[in-house]
Amino acid sequence: NAYQYFPQGTIHLAVIDPGVGSKRRGVGIRFAGGYLVGPDNGLFSGILSQSPALSAVNLNNSSYWRTPNPSTTFHGRDIFAAVAAYLARGVPLEMLGEIIDPDSLQQLAIAVLQIEEDKIRGQIQYIDIFGNLITNIPDYLLEGKNWSVQLVPKIIPAKNTYSDVPSGEIVAFIGSHGGLEIAVNSGSAQKQLHLNIGDAIEVRIDRSQ
C-alpha cells in the first residue's frame, strides 16, 4: 500500500528474488503511479491488482545493465539498480528491453473478497510486529456504514482507534494502511484470537439504521 504515498512518476525498485540467476525475467513496468523494476515473480501483484500495468518490458537489453556479465546471484545490483538509474535519467522504458504483454506478468494468488448485501468476507493478509491483524477489506466498503466483525462467538464493533476500548480489549477500525484492522489495546490480537495470515474474516453490515 505504501506506493500510493510516493510522488507521481516515482521509480520503485524492489528485489525479493529467490529465483535470481534462473530463467525468470527481469521486468520494467509502467503503471499509473510511475514505474516498477524488479524480478518477474509476482512481487508486484499487490500493486498491479489496484493499479494495472500500462506497459511492460523484459529487461534483456544488456546495454543498460551495470555489466554485460551480471552476477548470477546479484541482479539487484547488476541489472535492476542500473535500469532504475537509466529510467531516472529519462531513458524511455521501451529502450530497456523487449516489449511484453502486461498480461504475461507473473501474478501471485490474491484473495478475492466475497461481497453480499449485508456481509463482506475477506482474510488476514498481514500481521505486524505488534500482533495487529491487517485484512484485505478496503475502507471504501465500510465508510459510512454501521459494521462489526464477526468472530464467533465474538462480535467486535467498529471503533476509530485502539484507545476506544479498555486495555486488553479487542477493537476493529480502519487502519493507516486503508483497510480493516483488528487489534487489542495494549496487546496482541494474534495471540488473543489465535488467528494467522490467510484466516477468514467476516464483516456484518447493519442496514437497519
Language model features by range: what are they?
Residues 1, 6-9, 14-16, 20-78:
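Active-site histidine-anchored catalytic micro-motif
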Residues 3, 25-27, 47-48, 70-72, ...:
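A generic local secondary-structure boundary/capping motif
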Residues 10-13, 26-28, 34-37, 54-58, ...:
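Structural motif
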Residues 15-18, 31-32, 39-41, 47-50, ...:
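Fold-independent oxyanion-binding glycine-rich loops
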Residues 66-136, 141:
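Anionic-ligand-binding alpha/beta catalytic cores of soluble enzymes and soluble regulatory domains
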Residues 134-194:
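A conserved acidic, glycine/proline-rich C-terminal tail/linker
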Residues 197-206:
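Surface-exposed interaction regions enriched in Ser/Thr/Asp/Glu
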